[in-house]
């Protein structure tokens, strides 16, 4: 097919589908990470297209921290039932036994124990040799230098200086036993591309992305949604009801909402056309310290 005849989004779609099929053919035991967010929803949609009319030939894995928004978990279970894919859910048993919490232990330790260590446990448990992720290069500076095929050693660590060249869209998936590849089919998409594709393809998303009146607390410069009774108010804080939505979704105590009136997909796209900041600015874990995302990725974070 002549690339010149493809629209921008169709070119991105074709590239992503090619990557999905390449990994399914090349690796013995791939898995798709499913974080329930907008990028995961697009990646799932692309996987369904890539292997239609057959079923997706690999499971989806959600590393659950026990602190996700309730609407996210409801959406996850409803989506798995609707499309019939194999869904694996893993919670770090040691972290659960210790009662690790973003409130009591801080964002850095919570993320390391419940997400990074939990992910490594799951990858080791099932012996996956390739894992799809929905990260995009426009999200954050350490992700901007990520390869589409991102090599990880036996400890799941990422060394940005020890990666393979990807000339002419040729990917090197050769690994030794115990090593793995993280694969990012959406690398070349932007946040605006994601929203335009969701709109054009009528992809279902978690309602939290759309503006609504929600209970929030202003804390550390972020609007934190009071999603359940585990959110304890600090001195001087009060719950306010504001018209907000989320540009990015994670653990609710670590994810800031933005004030917005965009309660439709066209409204979100209009906001994206004039946005001047990254969606990751709403993630507390990205502000733990300078270079915090790259440090987390070196330790095994996605």
UniProtKB/Swiss-Prot annotation:
Region entry Disordered, spans: 279-302
Keyword Transferase attached: yes
Feature: compositional bias, Basic and acidic residues: 280-302
Swiss-Prot/TrEMBL keywords: ATP-binding, Nucleotide-binding, Nucleotidyltransferase, Transferase
SUPFAM superfamilies (alphabetical): Adenine nucleotide alpha hydrolases-like
Gene Ontology annotations of biological process type: hydrogen sulfide biosynthetic process; sulfate assimilation
Pathway where it operates: Sulfur metabolism; hydrogen sulfide biosynthesis; sulfite from sulfate: step 1/3
Enzyme Commission code: 2.7.7.4
Pfam families the record matches: PAPS_reduct
UniProt similarity note: Belongs to the PAPS reductase family. CysD subfamily.
Cited NCBIfam families: CysD, PRK05253.1, PRK12563.1
Protein name: Sulfate adenylyltransferase subunit 2
Lineage: Bacteria, Pseudomonadati, Pseudomonadota, Gammaproteobacteria, Vibrionales
Designated gene of the protein: cysD
């Amino acid at each position: 097919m002549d690339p010149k005849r493809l629209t921008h989004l169709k070119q991105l779609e074709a590239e992503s589908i090619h990557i999905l099929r390449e990994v399914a053919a090349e690796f013995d035991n791939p898995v798709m990470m499913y974080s329930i967010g907008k990028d995961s929803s697009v990646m799932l949609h692309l996987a369904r297209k890539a292997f239609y009319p057959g079923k997706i030939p690999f499971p989806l894995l959600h590393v659950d921290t026990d602190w996700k928004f309730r609407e996210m978990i409801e959406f996850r279970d409803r989506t798995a039932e609707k499309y019939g894919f194999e869904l694996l859910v893993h919670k770090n048993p040691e972290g659960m036994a210790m009662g690790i919490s973003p409130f009591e232990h801080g964002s850095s330790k919570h993320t390391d124990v419940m997400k990074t260590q939990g992910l490594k446990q799951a990858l080791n448990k099932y012996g996956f040799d390739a894992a799809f992720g929905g990260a995009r290069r426009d999200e954050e500076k350490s992700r901007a230098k990520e390869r589409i095929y991102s090599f990880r050693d036996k400890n799941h660590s990422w060394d940005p200086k020890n990666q393979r060249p990807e000339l002419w869209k040729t990917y090197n998936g050769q690994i030794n036993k115990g090593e793995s590849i993280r694969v990012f089919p959406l690398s070349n998409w932007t946040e605006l591309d994601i929203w335009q594709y969701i709109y054009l393809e009528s992809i279902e998303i978690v309602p939290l992305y759309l503006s609504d009146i929600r209970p929030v607390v202003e804390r550390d410069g972020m609007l934190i949604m009071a999603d359940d009774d585990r959110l304890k108010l600090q001195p001087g804080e009060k719950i306010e009801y504001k018209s907000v939505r989320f540009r990015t979704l994670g653990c609710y105590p670590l994810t800031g909402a933005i004030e917005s009136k965009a309660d439709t997909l066209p409204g979100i796209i209009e906001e994206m056309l004039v946005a001047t900041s990254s969606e990751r600015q709403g993630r507390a874990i990205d502000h733990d310290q300078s270079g915090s995302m790259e440090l987390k990725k070196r330790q095994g974070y996605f």
